[in-house]
């Protein structure tokens, strides 16, 4: 009997251990079983493309995923091609997309059958500043000088930007309304192309994100005139750039988010896995250095606070586009 009792305790203990292992395994069961398609709804060389191509090898370096992340650019229709592609992958957790404010602007401007609510939100990774840039050989050393020159010659100065009815054009319209001037707005497929147009003097100015122009700036090819925000960029190497208000007396601000979405209808476990993955990404020293080097503002956000942010950002974008005459 004593031996039988001992066996009973042993069997019971084994059952508890095995059950615990099975439960733990079930809670952490989901992970990618094939390469993840990392969709960038913009062209190569732009801020979104740069970020995605930084994140992909970072995930591999720190062994955060059992499968690689393959970056795929789908820039057509100001991001609509990429959004619709991901929307069409319903239930597939092996597709993600890196989104910008065109998540809101593109469907508002084009009527494309897409809304950010059609996808599964994962996380906001960072906020991106905008800066007014000119060619380094431009005679204009300050934003005030440049604005006065543009104001004196309406429809003479070219402002290059990414897409039509997107962030760059919205900011351009903000400037036109604030200062009573008029640019010739020239759209390009991506921020990299926009930056190159300024270097090649095919445009007179841009409002590129810092990450899109920093290489040209450090090489002495372009010049920042003002940060389009209420406060200066509080990062090494960027603090000397005045705000638009400091440079011109007129206050202007616009920040763009960078976020991650999954297709609709993916398993909750997959969504949670990606939330955890990108939280780990943002905790790496490489990520923190990347934010500093590219003048990106740390702003990790998930869950209900992320949904609230997206709703408010959508409303703001709609209001600005209406004021700018981009939508009715």
Task: Please place each PLM-identified region on the residue numbering.
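Short, low-complexity disordered leader/linker segments with a strong preference
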Residues: 1-33, 328
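N-terminal (or domain-start) structured segment
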Residues: 28-118, 156, 164, 180-209, ...
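An extracytoplasmic/periplasmic, membrane-proximal ligand-sensing/linker region
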Residues: 33-35, 181, 218, 268-328
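Short coil/turn segments
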Residues: 44-45, 101, 135-140, 162-166, ...
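Hinge/capping helix and adjacent helix->loop/strand transition within the periplasmic-binding protein
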Residues: 61, 85-95, 107-193, 244, ...
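A ligand-binding cleft/hinge motif common to bilobed small-molecule-binding domains
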Residues: 101-111, 173-178, 205-240
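C-terminal lobe and pocket-closing loops
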Residues: 127, 213-283, 312-315
């Amino acid at each position: 009997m004593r031996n039988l009792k001992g066996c009973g305790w042993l069997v019971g203990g084994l059952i508890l251990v095995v059950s615990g292992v099975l439960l733990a395994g079930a809670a952490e069961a989901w992970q990618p079983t094939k390469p993840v398609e990392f969709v960038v709804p913009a062209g190569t060389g732009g801020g979104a493309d740069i970020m995605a191509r930084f994140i992909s090898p970072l995930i591999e370096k720190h062994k955060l995923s059992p499968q690689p992340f393959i970056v795929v650019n789908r820039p057509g229709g100001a991001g609509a091609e990429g959004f619709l592609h991901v929307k069409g992958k319903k239930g597939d957790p092996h597709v993600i997309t890196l989104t910008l404010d065109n998540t809101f602007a593109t469907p508002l401007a084009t009527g494309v059958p897409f809304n950010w609510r059609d996808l599964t939100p994962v996380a906001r990774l960072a906020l991106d500043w905008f800066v007014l840039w000119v060619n380094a050989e431009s005679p204009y050393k300050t934003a005030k000088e440049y604005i006065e020159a543009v104001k004196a010659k309406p429809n003479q100065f070219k402002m290059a930007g990414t897409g039509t009815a997107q962030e760059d054009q919205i900011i351009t319209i903000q400037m036109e309304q604030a200062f009573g001037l008029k640019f010739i707005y020239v759209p390009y497929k991506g921020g990299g192309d926009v930056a190159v147009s300024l270097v090649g003097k095919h445009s007179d100015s841009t409002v590129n994100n810092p990450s899109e122009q920093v290489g040209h700036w450090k090489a002495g090819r372009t010049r920042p005139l003002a940060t389009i925000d209420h406060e200066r960029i509080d990062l090494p190497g960027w603090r000397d750039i005045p705000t638009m208000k400091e440079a011109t007396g007129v206050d202007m601000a616009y920040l763009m988010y960078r976020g991650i979405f999954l297709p609709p209808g993916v398993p909750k476990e997959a969504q949670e896995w990606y939330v955890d993955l990108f939280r780990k990404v943002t905790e790496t020293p490489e990520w923190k250095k990347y934010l500093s080097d590219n003048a990106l503002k740390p702003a990790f956000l998930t869950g209900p606070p992320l949904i609230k942010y997206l709703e408010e950002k959508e409303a703001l974008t709609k209001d600005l586009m209406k004021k700018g005459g981009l939508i009715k």
